[in-house]
Amino acid sequence: MPCVPNCFEVPFLEDLDDFIMLSVNQIKFLRSLRERKYRLREQAFAVEGPKLVGEMLPFYRCRMLVGTAAMLRAVSTPHDAEVVELPESFDFKRISTQTSPQPLMAVFDLPAEPEPVVEGLTLLLDGVQDPGNVGTILRTADWFGIRHVWLGTGSADVFSPKVVQASMGALARVQPPPLKNTVDTLAYFRRQGIPVYGAFLEGQSLYEAPLPNFTEPAILVLGSEGRGISPEVAAEITDRLTIPASGLSVKGHTESLNVAIAAAILCSEWRRRS
């Protein structure tokens, strides 16, 4: 993770006679970070709201803080960050992705991509494209103390605004390296003797299958919303798990669970066994 910058409070902002307004280029820059290609080009991503900004500040290098005086006072700011104080009258929707934005935005440097490691239960998202689902899975992982969530090919960018918002600060604690080759990565860890579990519609019941302790190395693969786990990734899985539907319904049941809900059920049962 990035180094932690020194922080200090910014009481001097309330004494400024004039507000520093955003330039046209600054507005274009902030809006451009909504798209992945510009995040990669600028090596930066944006976070909105005092809660999320406050959670991310100790873990990512802050490049820029933009907000009203009240919002800026709610957080500490790194000494080397550019600070732009806006008047209450500024229409924050000009730079925000939110319908009802809180007038605070931070721009952070993208972190160096960590190497994939397995420490306890590790999640792998195979083509999970929906940003809301990816963010919710990161939040679920954080809740259960899972520190490693890998992003397989085709998964949503974790630094997109929707994923950042849905993760509710989990990116401060969960490391999500994108995998250059999902199959090769799984094959490598399989050779190290690490079991690879996968969530399928058909498999051994989660509630009957033997599971390793939560702290023991294991990989759990979650497939995309539409097609599930891809065939090439499925070939590397050692244990197939399924969440059985309730037998109480006599007229059938819904075809499948949302991937984020399935992740929460799987992680909860894994933790309960430990």
Regions found by a protein language model. Give the residues of each.
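RNA substrate-binding interface of SAM-dependent RNA methyltransferases
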Residues: 112-206
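Short beta->alpha connector loops at strand-helix junctions that form conserved
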Residues: 86-88, 126, 152-153, 175, ...
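Structured adenosyl-cofactor binding patch, chiefly the S-adenosyl-L-methionine
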Residues: 106, 143, 158, 163-170, ...
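Arg/Lys-rich RNA-binding interfaces used to dock onto structured RNA substrates
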Residues: 7-131, 271
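Active-site/ligand-binding-proximal alpha/beta "capping" segment
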Residues: 198-254
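Amphipathic alpha-helical repeat scaffolds
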Residues: 49, 129-136, 255-262
